[in-house]
Every structure is written in C-alpha cells, then in structure tokens.
From Swiss-Prot:
One example of a Gene Ontology biological process annotation: translation
Family the UniProt entry places it in: Belongs to the universal ribosomal protein uL5 family.
Described function: This is one of the proteins that bind and probably mediate the attachment of the 5S RNA into the large ribosomal subunit, where it forms part of the central protuberance. In the 70S ribosome it contacts protein S13 of the 30S subunit (bridge B1b), connecting the 2 subunits; this bridge is implicated in subunit movement. Contacts the P site tRNA; the 5S rRNA and some of its associated proteins might help stabilize positioning of ribosome-bound tRNAs.
GO molecular function term, any single one: tRNA binding
UniProt superkingdom: Bacteria
Descriptive protein name: Large ribosomal subunit protein uL5
PANTHER family from the UniProt entry: 60S RIBOSOMAL PROTEIN L11-RELATED
Species: Pseudomonas aeruginosa (strain ATCC 15692 / DSM 22644 / CIP 104116 / JCM 14847 / LMG 12228 / 1C / PRS 101 / PAO1)
CC annotations in GO: cytosolic large ribosomal subunit
Keyword tRNA-binding: yes
Length: 179
C-alpha cells in the first residue's frame, strides 16, 4: 500500500472527521484522481513534439498518456479539427498516492523560487488545480535528454463539497500553501 494512502486512512481521515464534524467516515473528503495535462499548441507542425511529451509524461507517472485532439478548427490558433494538441494522463488509487507523495516530497522543493502554492486555486467544489512551468522538477526526467522545457497542469479531484473542505484535506496532506 502507498505510504500516503496509509497515512490518510490512519491519521488524516479520523482527524478530518472530527475537524469537519462529520457523522460517518465515508463523508470525509478524499482525493479521487489526479489528472496531468500537457497542452502542446506548438505540436501542430511537428509530430516529434507529441512523441517526446508522451515519453516525458510516461516517465513522470509510470502510465501511458492519451493524446488529445482538437475538437474543432480554430483559424486564429492555426489548428484543424482532429489534429493532436496535447497529452493527458489520469492517475487513481495507489499510483495516484505514490505520485502525490513524490510531488510533495521531491518535486515541489525542486521548483526554482518556490514560495508555496496558491491557496485560491480551488474551483468552488473542492478540486485543486496547479501549474508547473518545467517538467524537469520531476527526478524521473533527465535534464540532458529533453528537447524543450514544457509545463503541465495538475488537477486534484476530491470528494470535498466545498473549497474549505478541500483546503482542509490538502492541508492535512501537508501541501505547502502560501499564507
């Protein structure tokens, strides 16, 4: 079992149940999935960019990403319907907790000029989104073998009903929020 999953079950869930005054353990907010998305607008002219992004995300997550395609043509962005424009991967269960553990303990401390995560990046329903400017903060990526620095979006989907519940959950996981 993943380390964070065990910590959640034994320490975080009982503490949150008391803190949020919930009647049942199943009401306690939990992280259901983590979605990593890499938007690649520059991939329009070059297939190699998509292949490299897929390889990077696969190294980071240990799971094969899905290529996303444009749903409709937009002349302003010079894209046509059906062209590949990004890659995404959804992590659940043990892989999700292992990724979250690596993100909090290894990757975020490696971010340059890191002052904490924005505590206002909740969507109103307890889900949290954050952006990473460079994929090299992950130790799985070899700096010498990358072709370009690419950012990615990380979304944590939770069962929390409000932002305050979601914030309490992530604080219990020791997320480094800015004050």
């Amino acid at each position: 079992m993943a380390r964070l999953k065990e910590i959640y079950r034994k320490e975080i869930a009982p503490k949150l149940k008391e803190e949020l005054q919930l009647a049942n353990v199943m009401e306690v907010p939990r992280v259901t999935k983590i979605t990593l998305n890499m938007g690649l607008g520059e991939a329009v002219g070059d297939k190699k960019i998509i292949e490299n992004a897929v390889a990077d995300l696969e190294k980071i997550t240990g799971q094969k990403p899905v290529v996303t395609y444009a749903r409709k043509s937009i002349a302003g962005f010079k894209i046509r319907e059906g062209w590949p424009i990004g890659v995404k991967v959804t992590l659940r269960s043990d892989r999700m907790y292992e990724f979250l553990d690596r993100l909090l303990s290894i990757s975020l401390p490696r971010v340059r000029d890191f002052r904490g995560l924005n505590a206002k990046s909740f969507d109103g329903r307890g889900n949290y989104s954050m952006g990473v400017k460079e994929q090299i903060i992950f130790p799985e990526i070899d700096y010498d073998k990358i072709d370009a620095l690419r950012g990615l979006d990380i979304t944590l989907t939770t069962t929390a009903r409000t932002d305050d519940e979601g914030r309490a959950l992530l604080r219990a996981f020791k997320f480094p929020f800015r004050n």
